[in-house]
């Protein structure tokens, strides 16, 4: 609801006054002396003045080895002020299609002056921009993904091996080699990075492959690089050309133009929908370029995310995409693909902080290449720690490159690491009832499942001290992101615990909060704390279908205080 406000002119200024702020504006081009906002009579902001910011997120971690600077978020530790410039954002029309950019040069600013009321700021941002949609339940299970030239037999055999080892999976990702990557005439057509025709050398009967994946209870997503359009060798080219009013005999490439509504309609209807009817559940949009639109100013990535997400919802089921972050408001189109990360300890050490801090923009569902993608070397300890983080991150998606030394099957890393990783992946599956309830909490109450601990404890200095500590729903997680000591075989992690008593989930040890503690953990354990009174619903069977309610539950209870938990089951 619009708050009560007073609007008047005085001393050559327009004044807008609410209970909490006083805006003064000279009604000229914005300037530091012409536009200012005073919050609660104390904090004064002038246009163009930078204030401290707790960070938000970035478009991608491509080519980032370790840490990178983050774009601003909505939260500020010192001044409690942030400003979002929304001037160049595409506007959605009443018919659901983006409107042409008007190019008036006008400024469209949103001012947030919440002080340390961090949770309220994020909740109100969701009210302004729409809540995070409800995810399909299956997205919370374990995913398998690898950039590798799989055949149908090899892929299905791998899925069967995971099942034989009682390692649950819910989503199978097929990277770009599902389609033809060697074009019939490279001089004429260019590379096969973009493609839409199944490669029969690897998938001689792709419909049967998809049917077999469904028999195994797996959802399927395929990788797309749409940039190079649809070329004459593609199976659907003649039909698409005719539907777009073009002569297929010319063999001219149909350019990919995300601003062309007619093209986009047929891109879905003619190119993608038939595959969805065959069993593809959603698409991994691997867009890495800036161009791809005939209209200046259109962010092609933003348009792709919007169009794909809306289209995937057309049959009434909960939609899903996997794509890079396209700017503030992208929380409306989950999930986020963070890009091709490096296989290094430095990359792992950055990801917990990076993931949680995105909640400062309401961006709740990052999906990382768990284990990394680029470069690297075979390191059982590194991969085990990465899997542990993945289990306690928004999306648990194992991923790797074609490098045979870095493929992420747990049994490739020795008996100790294999057993630990498989136990964690089973735990992830058992956590689905808990996480699914957190999905609803995010949707209804505006509280992301993964967020910095200072969201809940904004006035306690210790909450800002441990960058890789975060809230995982009601739990406090602090994944190990550094090597263990070669003598003790223990890894040190410093954690801040709020006031109260806490139980370490893996050891059962009880800690008194209100302080920083140094934890030392062997490879099989990571710091995970449940406050006294916490109730954690777990699926009794780790191999239960992640997409349906489990037949039986087990409850983990952290004793020492009364507690309650609202379990959501709606499938």
Which residues does each PLM region occupy?
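Alpha-amylase-like alpha-glycosidases and glucanotransferases acting on alpha-linked glucans and related
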Residues: 245-287, 316-344, 398-421
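Secondary-structure transition/capping motifs at alpha-helix termini
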Residues: 133-135, 163-171, 205-221, 273-281, ...
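Flexible loop/turn segments at secondary-structure boundaries
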Residues: 81-82, 89-92, 118, 148-151, ...
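Conserved, mostly hydrophobic/aromatic
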Residues: 20, 73, 162, 213, ...
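Catalytic and substrate-binding clefts that recognize carbohydrates or anionic sugar/phosphate headgroups
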Residues: 5-137, 146-147, 152-153, 157-164, ...
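Structural recognition of the beta-strand scaffold that forms the well-ordered cores
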Residues: 74-75, 80-83, 140-143, 170-174, ...
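Aromatic-lined carbohydrate-binding/catalytic grooves of carbohydrate-active enzymes
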Residues: 133-292, 331
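Catalytic core of carbohydrate-active enzymes
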Residues: 309, 329-336, 350-354, 358-368, ...
């Amino acid at each position: 609801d619009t708050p009560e406000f007073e609007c008047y002119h005085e001393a050559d200024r327009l004044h807008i006054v609410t209970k909490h702020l006083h805006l003064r504006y000279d009604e000229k081009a914005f300037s530091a002396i012409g536009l200012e906002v005073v919050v609660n009579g104390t904090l004064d902001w002038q246009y163009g003045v930078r204030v401290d910011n707790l960070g938000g997120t970035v478009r991608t971690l491509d080519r980032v080895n370790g840490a990178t600077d983050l774009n601003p978020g909505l939260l500020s530790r010192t001044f409690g002020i942030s400003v979002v410039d929304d001037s160049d954002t595409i506007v959605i029309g009443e018919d659901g299609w983006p409107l042409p950019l008007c190019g008036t040069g006008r400024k469209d600013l949103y001012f947030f002056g919440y002080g340390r009321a961090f949770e309220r700021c994020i909740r109100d941002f969701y009210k302004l921009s729409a809540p995070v949609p409800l995810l399909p339940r299956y997205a919370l299970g374990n995913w398998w993904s690898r950039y590798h030239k799989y055949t149908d037999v090899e892929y299905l055999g791998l899925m069967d091996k995971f099942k034989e080892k009682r390692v649950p999976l819910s989503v199978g990702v097929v990277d770009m080699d599902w389609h033809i990557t060697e074009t019939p005439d490279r001089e004429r057509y260019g590379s096969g990075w973009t493609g839409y025709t199944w490669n029969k050398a690897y998938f001689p009967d792709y419909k049967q492959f998809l049917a077999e994946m469904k028999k195994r209870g797996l959802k399927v997503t395929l990788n797309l690089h749409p940039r190079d359009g649809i070329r004459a060798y593609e199976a659907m080219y003649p039909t698409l050309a005719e539907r777009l009013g073009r002569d297929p005999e010319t063999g001219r490439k149909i350019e990919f133009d995300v601003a062309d509504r007619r093209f986009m309609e047929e891109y879905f209807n003619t190119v993608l929908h038939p595959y969805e009817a065959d069993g593809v559940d959603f698409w991994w949009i691997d867009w890495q370029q800036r161009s791809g639109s005939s209209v200046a100013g259109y962010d092609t990535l933003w348009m792709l995310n919007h169009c794909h997400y809306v289209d995937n919802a057309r049959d009434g089921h909960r939609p899903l995409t996997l794509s890079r972050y396209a700017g503030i408001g992208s929380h409306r189109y989950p999930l986020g693909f963070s890009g091709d990360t490096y296989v290094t300890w430095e990359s792992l050490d950055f990801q917990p902080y990076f993931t949680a801090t995105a909640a400062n923009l309401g961006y709740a569902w990052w999906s990382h290449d768990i284990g990394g993608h680029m470069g690297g070397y075979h390191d059982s300890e590194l991969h085990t720690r990465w899997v542990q983080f993945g289990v306690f991150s928004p999306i648990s998606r194992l991923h790797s490159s074609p490098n045979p030394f870095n493929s992420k099957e747990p049994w490739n890393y020795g008996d100790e690491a294999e057993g630990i990783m498989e136990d964690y992946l089973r735990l992830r599956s058992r956590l689905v009832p808990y996480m699914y309830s957190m999905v609803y909490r995010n949707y209804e109450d505006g509280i992301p499942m993964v967020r910095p601990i200072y969201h809940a404890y904004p006035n306690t200095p210790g909450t800002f001290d441990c960058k890789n500590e975060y809230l995982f729903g009601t739990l406090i997680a602090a994944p190990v992101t550094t090597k263990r000591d070669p003598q003790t075989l223990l890894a040190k992690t410093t954690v801040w615990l709020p006031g109260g008593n806490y139980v370490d989930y893996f050891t059962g040890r009880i800690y008194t909060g209100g302080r920083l503690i140094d934890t030392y953990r062997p490879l099989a354990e990571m710091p995970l704390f449940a406050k006294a009174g916490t109730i954690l619903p777990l699926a009794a069977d780790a191999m239960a279908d992640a997409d349906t309610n489990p037949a039986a539950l087990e409850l983990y209870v952290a004793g020492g205080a009364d507690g309650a938990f609202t379990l959501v089951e709606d499938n």
